[in-house]
Every structure is written in C-alpha cells, then in structure tokens.
Amino acid sequence: MRCPFCGGPDTQVKDSRPSEDSSAIRRRRVCPDCGGRFTTFERVQLRELVVLKRSGKRVPFDRDKLQRSIDVALRKRTVDPERVERLVSGITRRLESGGEGEVTSEAIGEAVMEGLKGLDDVAYVRFASVYKNFREAQDFQDLLGTLGERLDGEGDLPEQGDAVPAPPDEAVAAPRRGRPARKRA
C-alpha cells in the first residue's frame, strides 16, 4: 500500500487485529522510507452498490461519505465511537444485502434517520433538518412533535405542567475552565 505521507510504494504491516464487532480488520502500517505510521481498515464488500440520486445521477456508494454525514450530525455529542461504527456497518450491510445493485439516496437517508433516532435525538434532528431540507421553524416543530410523541410513550419527557427537576448544586456551581475573565475598566 502506498504511504499517504511521502507516497512511498511499499509499507509494512506492524499490527493486525479484528475490530470489536469483527466487521473489519484493523492494520497498523509503517513506511520504511519516511517512518510515517497510519491505520487501514479492511472490510467485506458484498457487492458494488450504485446510488441513484434525486437528480437522476448515478454514483458509486461511498461508505466514508456515509460515515462523515453521521459524524457531522453527531458533532460535539457524547456517543461512543463503537456505536457509531456499528450503525455505519449495519446500514452498509443492510444496503448491500438488499438484493439490488442500485439504492436510492432516499433509502440511505431514511436508514440513517432510523439509526440516529435510536442513537441520539439531537443528531437525529440535525440530520433530518438537512436531509428533509427544512426551511422554516415549523418544520422543526413538526419533527420535534413526532419525536416528543415517541418519547412520551416511553415516559422520558415530563408531562405538560409537571415540575422539571432543578439541576444538582454541583452543576450550577461548576468551576470554570480556561483562562479567568479579564476585568474591564
């Protein structure tokens, strides 16, 4: 494999092990020319998928693009990376084993929304706002209404009129991080 740092033609595998869910093989590589170290992943690809976009254009399926779009929705959220990897692998496997060589971008978007709904509600709303092309605040209210109905059934949200518990004292008086604020004259 070519070195991504210096372009050297040969790299050596220093460590090879399966990922936690055994869906990929993780390899640590080193370049003998520049000493650069990097990681590669080897995954099973059941078939070459083609994505049919809304415009009618056909493009090859890109697992990395799927990963990036989920990562953007999850930015600054505390979700275990292993759960994200399982979500991406699950969506990819479902698409590849669907029996079709061609999949619509809508099917991919719906699969991502379904997965994010079970993973992180904020990421679900973020992704939905881009995927469904929200233009007005009402679009968000409608989505949050359906999300609230789902959560009400699970007992996660307080009923209207219920008291919302106050945050613990340590959350209110948490120490500040970083530089102290400058005094203004």
Curated annotation (Swiss-Prot):
Cofactor section: Zn(2+)
Domain ATP-cone: 49-139
Sequence similarity: Belongs to the NrdR family.
Zn finger limits (unnamed): 3-34
Function recorded in the entry: Negatively regulates transcription of bacterial ribonucleotide reductase nrd genes and operons by binding to NrdR-boxes.
Keywords: ATP-binding, DNA-binding, Metal-binding, Nucleotide-binding, Repressor, Transcription, Transcription regulation, Zinc, Zinc-finger
Free-text comment on the cofactor: Binds 1 zinc ion.
GO molecular function (one): zinc ion binding
Compositional bias per record (Basic and acidic residues), positions renumbered to this chain: 12-24
Protein name as annotated: Transcriptional repressor NrdR
GO biological process, one term: negative regulation of DNA-templated transcription
Superkingdom to which the source organism belongs: Bacteria
Organism: Methylorubrum extorquens (strain CM4 / NCIMB 13688) (Methylobacterium extorquens)
Pfam family, one: Zn_ribbon_NrdR
Coiled-coil positions: none
Residues covered by region (Disordered): 1-24, 148-185
Classification of source organism: Bacteria, Pseudomonadati, Pseudomonadota, Alphaproteobacteria, Hyphomicrobiales
InterPro entries on file: ATP-cone_dom (IPR005144), NrdR-like_N (IPR055173), RNR_NrdR-like (IPR003796)
UniProt feature, compositional bias: Basic residues: 176-185
